[in-house]
Amino acid sequence: MQPPTRAPFFPFSLLRGRKARETCTCRSVASTEGPNTFGPRARPGCHAHQVAPSKESFHSSAFQLVSASRLSPLMSSCFVSFLRYPSFRPSAPFSAPPSSSTVPISTPSDFSHSAPASWRCVPTAPSALHAPFSFTTQAAHLSSCVFDGCSRLPCSEPGSPQTLQRALATTSATAFLRTACMSHRLRRRPDAWTSGCSGQTDNATASPCVRPLLRPPVDTASRAAANDKDAPQPTCFWRNARTSRAVHRNQTDMNFSSFSCSLRPCRHTLAKAAGHHAPLSRHSLQSLPESRIRGGTVSRGDSPGSLTLSPRNMSSDAMPVHPLYFPSAVPFSTTSGSNSSTFSCPSPSSSTSSTSSTSSTSSTSSTSSTSSTSSTSSTSSTSSPFLLSRSHSVDCRACPVSRAPPNPTSLQLLFSLFPFLWPTALKDRLRVLGSVACLVTAKVLTIQAPLLLANLVDAFQVLPHNSPLSPSGASPSSGDTSLLASSGETSSSLSPSAAPAEGAREAGKSGESAGRERRDEGSTVRLSPLAEGPASPATEERTAAGKAGTSVGGRDAGAVHALDTEHLRNTAQIVSVPLGVVCGFPVARIAATGFNELRSTLFTRVSQNASCDFSCHAFLHLHALALFHDKRAGELSVLISRGMKSVTALLNVLLFQMVPTALEFALVLYLLGSKVGGPVACITSLTMAVYVAFTAAVTARRTKIRKEMIAAEQQSVGLLVDSLANAEAVRFFTAEKGELSRFEAVQRRYAEKHVSVNQSLAFLNFGQQLIFNVGVLGSLAYTASQVAAGLLPVGHIVLVSSLLLQLAVPLNFVGTIYRETSLNLADLEKLYELMNHHPPIVNPPDARPFVLKGGAVAFENVRFAYPPSPLRPGSLPSKTGDDEKPEASRMLLDDVSFSVDAGKKVAIVGPSGVGKSTLIKLLFRMFDPASGTVRIDDQDVKELDLHSFRRQIGVVPQDMVLFNDTIEFNIKYGCPSATDEEMRAAAKQAEIDDVIMRMPQGYSTVVGERGLKLSGGERQRIGIARCLLRNPAIAVFDEATSALDSHTEQKILKAFRAMARGRTTLVIAHRLSTISDADKIIYLKEGKIAEMGTHAELLEKERGLYRALWESQQHQEQEEAVSTPDLTLS
């Protein structure tokens, strides 16, 4: 199957904990004076750590730069110090220190030595930025600023006081890493490396870039050196690699070593030209801002100007290089080391295939470029995993769906989960290995426990008959009573009523016979390993006592002494011999349990990480589908939750049930066959075969019933969620009883299926226990017959029973494994059906990043019709574009062509259903037209990266749906990195700030489900504030005032006009009074453009469609105005 769409701002490889550190060292050198190149639509800069400046840092002679950490173009006081450009001559209220070439914007009147913490002071001595700066990036941590979509600065627009305020808001003291389009420039102009952004780049090749804010001040000496024709003129510029590169316009003096991570110092430095300046102190480097990417330190480099940025101290503007943000054409490569990776990119000489390889520098550059190119195309293990964009199914183990074919079988589904068993993260791999080790150890201890128990029984079997723990020692009336009778008779001979001498001789004969029996017993071989070997000392003493009884006969005192000695020695032997066996059995059981719990603890994190990654992948995939028209939200939630649980359950089945159960079966059968005999092993094998066959047959039936139950549950939950979402409609139409009857019918069907599942489970459990216990009965009967015949010791009965009971656990797991695996595969199959839906729109393989030039929009001969039905699971998306030519009768849009110039306002009107909103979807590329082209700034949207141009478009829809969260969250959704001040400024322009502040909780007020706690006008104005905060280049309003009253409409129109100022605006309007000031009005009828022109031009047409609609609305408004007093009086 085709891998599902991966949004370029969702790096799944990071979810697995894979980390790679990439280090590049670059130099920031003095820039030549050029025109100011700030554009009108700067994206707001991101948060940075606020450092309160000291009083000394504001001394004018130190050439300080004061930079705002986060200023919005919406705010009226954006004061940032910047370096002067010859083309910009600031006027009041700007002033420049006479002794400095820097031209700071004057700060607010209350800005004094106790400046707010949001202002930072950065020394700008000539040596401050001339030393190499070492940037260390780590792609495992990203800022939320990555996900906000704000426009960038075009490089070619001239500066002006109006646009300067927007432009400066994007810069900060850490502007070394900036967003731009490097690969586009490299493909179209390889020599762009030497042109930079000095104002000489033409518009065709100009890419969005931002000049470095922090530049060393150019004093008189440096200006004199810059005017020297022989001196190389370095130029700083910025690319999508977010790395500052310094190159020289003088090609013969290039000394950059193929832009590798160790750029050689330039021969001409400002330090030589301005040697009177003191070197940069360490304190000034540490005053540079730390980032929002969570804490960090500034490491001390090799030189005073060295700075190391990591994800802990790097600004969100300094986003790390990641393959998801680069097309494959970016000529970067890496050489991975133990802890870092170095960047390299081809030099101008190798890129343009020049012949300037006579010098050593050019040769070095070409060599490095060659190795860079080969490293780029290489997929060896030494290349960095974070530089080249690879296929989603190869780069990401978090999405096994991309490895499964359409409509996969159960075996294919299981194999698709195997990558989870060997994760990418080293810690997770160690957890898996530890889990396997604990599993094997627990199984060995589990099998060893029955053996220890059998040895314990055998140890008691070989005890002496007259020991205290033996039957003979426990009762004087049992066991071997000959010696006790002898002693009793001997003691009676000492009594006053002594027997005659004949009695003594009979006692002597009895003692002699007892001695022979004891000698024979001492030489008997026991049926136990513990009985093998020479006779024990107690047996020898009993034999000696027998001999003494024969020789002495009536010497009763000697017999009594021998018996006492024998009892004392046997007691010591009983305590010492079986104690280890007695303790070994419980210790083995406890250790096995401990290792099992440790295994579960180690693997839980691995399985939960896998489930989390899989759910994130499914979540992202759902957002790429046009699927929600056919499935209820409740059904989708149940489907995804069950699918996630099935992933975790199946991972445990694969690693801890299938293989361990087979291993335990083999061990048990081997022990039974070797210790007890082949018949017992055969009986056990037959029992297992019948058990498995019965379980498979019953579980197959249960799986079918379980699928029906799951379908009924999904329908029940979907109906519940759908009914609750439309609770107001239910109350309005008094349909509570109808909804209850529908829900009751679905619930009863679910209950019936649930009862069937439980009944089949009870039958399965009873059958399993019956089969198993019959097998146990047969094995024990055979073992007992062998023990009774004297062929096996008594302990083997315990061994067989223990092993069979031990085998009951995996036998039960065989049924559980088969049953749960079948059910989990059924749940996972449903999820795979959803995941196998292909998104209607995907990025092209060679997608280009969008280059903003102003925001002009053009539709050229567009024809479009919606697909007749949604995609079926596993089917490929239907062809769209020039290959498919639907009939004109089915066309929603037929040969529509118009253009919107940059910064202009165009309105689209017409009856309902003519395709006005469809134009917005085509502009966003939610669908592709059947024919024709949609262009933005002369770039076909089919050839662009989806997110690169969608970030430049802001939409205010007709039905504004808000998240069930706070107002602050909903407004900042347009730009999550915005500050509270920027949010308030956007809300004020949207005429909603006063309403929010009157609420008890202000911006922390929760808006409710879909924002139903707010009125329609309030939701619309929150949507406008969100779009204002996003600051897009193209603004789209889709009938945003059609359902509002006139008073609210006027407020929203005022916010519209504020937002549309300086932006390309596309308005779909129902009320013509709202678009009378549009630069162009397009009237659509039956999928075609019927009329086009300005408001005045269209009204001049006598029988024009627009004029008729205008007159109709004016007449309706007049009637409403006349009837309003009557309604109020009544």
From Swiss-Prot:
- What is the deletion mutant like? Conditional knockdown results in reduced formation of plaques. Subtle but significant growth defects in parasites. Reduced number of parasites per vacuole. Partial conversion into bradyzoites. Altered levels of iron-sulfur cluster proteins. Global decrease in cytosolic translation. No significant effects on mitochondrial morphology and function.
Gene Ontology terms, MF aspect: ABC-type transporter activity; ATP binding; ATP hydrolysis activity
Domain ABC transporter: start-end pairs: 857-1111
Write out the GO cellular component annotations.
mitochondrial inner membrane
Tell me where it resides.
Mitochondrion membrane
Residue ranges annotated as compositionally biased, kind Polar residues, are 195-206, 305-315
Mitochondrion among keywords: yes
- Name the enzyme group at the top EC level: translocase
Q: Name one Pfam family in it.
A: ABC_membrane
Q: Which residues form the ABC transmembrane type-1 domain?
A: 587-823
Q: Which InterPro entries match?
A: AAA+_ATPase, ABC1_TM_dom, ABC1_TM_sf, ABC_transporter-like_ATP-bd, ABC_transporter-like_CS, P-loop_NTPase, Type_1_exporter
Where's the transit peptide located?
1-65
Spell out the PROSITE patterns in the cross-references: ABC_TM1F (PS50929), ABC_TRANSPORTER_1 (PS00211), ABC_TRANSPORTER_2 (PS50893)
Question: Bias category Low complexity: which stretches?
Answer: 468-502
Query: Annotated region Disordered: where?
Result: 191-212, 276-315, 341-385, 468-554
Classify the protein's membrane topology as the record does: Multi-pass membrane protein
Assigned EC number = 7.-.-.-
Tell me the subunit arrangement: Homodimer.
| Function per UniProt | Probably transports iron-sulfur clusters in an ATP-dependent manner. Plays a role in [Fe-S] proteins homeostasis. Required for optimal parasite growth and lytic cycle.
Family per UniProt? Belongs to the ABC transporter superfamily. ABCB family. Heavy Metal importer (TC 3.A.1.210) subfamily.
Q: What is this protein called?
A: ABC transporter ATM1
> Lineage, please?
Eukaryota, Sar, Alveolata, Apicomplexa, Conoidasida
